[in-house]
Amino acid sequence: MTSADQLLHAELPPRPAVLTALNDEIQSEEPDLNRVSDLVSGDVGLAAAVIKTVNSPYFGLSRQVASVRQAVTFLGLAEVFGVVTGACLRRSFVSNDPMMEQIWDESAARGASMRRLASELHVLAPDRAYTCGLFENAGMALLLVHAPGYAHTASQAGDGMALMERERVRYGVDHPTLGQALMRTWGLPEELALAVRQHHGLAQLDDAEMPLLARQLVALSTMANAALSDERADWESNRALIAHIVEAAEEQLQRLFDELATLDPMRN
């Protein structure tokens, strides 16, 4: 059996070099857009993944982009960094199990949906919402690669809370904890890592001791996950609280929810 210590330390992939280089450039006094574009375009597979993601319906661009440079121009540095982070995350875990593709497809749809909600509601930076959505199930990808029998364990669970309990019993750690640890390893903001850790913890939504940004991210996650699935009980029972946390009217949230529910996450 894979130990919790192994999963939390030895099995966490290091931050990709391209992310470190991108972050250094973006945080410089005068970021060079051409340098940013060149860093991403230097990896053909990464560039293709970025362009494909940016052209998805969730990003709502008025026209398709054909290059990384165009993506940088239309979205800005912060959002492109988020998209590159997502592409690197997907490449960090490789498995022939069909569950892996499902994890990443759902993560891409969730991240883009949370980004869209953040953008429409003007409640927090869209790139942060996007990144948080991508990492929510990153711990599942790690378990699928390194934990024996994980696909079967996951298939036997019902909702997210039941899955977490099964993970803790069998592997000594759950996927939100692993996702949080990975975000910290990659140097991502602590509020985002906390939101990933708590994304199944709806009881934390009205916890004043939890940072507001983290609660807002959990709220958007709850909304996005419900719109992308048939499991809508959490959204429906917490709609008023979610509206309060993101400072929006329930009618506006319902309209956005309905729009998300009609989008095909795999359409490009």
Locate each region found by the language model.
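Conserved alpha-helical "signature site"
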Residues: M1-A151, M161-R232, P265
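Terminal helices and disordered tails flanking the catalytic cores of nucleotide-processing hydrolases
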Residues: M1-A4, S237-N268
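Helical (often loop-to-helix) elements that flank the catalytic cores of nucleotide-handling enzymes
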Residues: A154
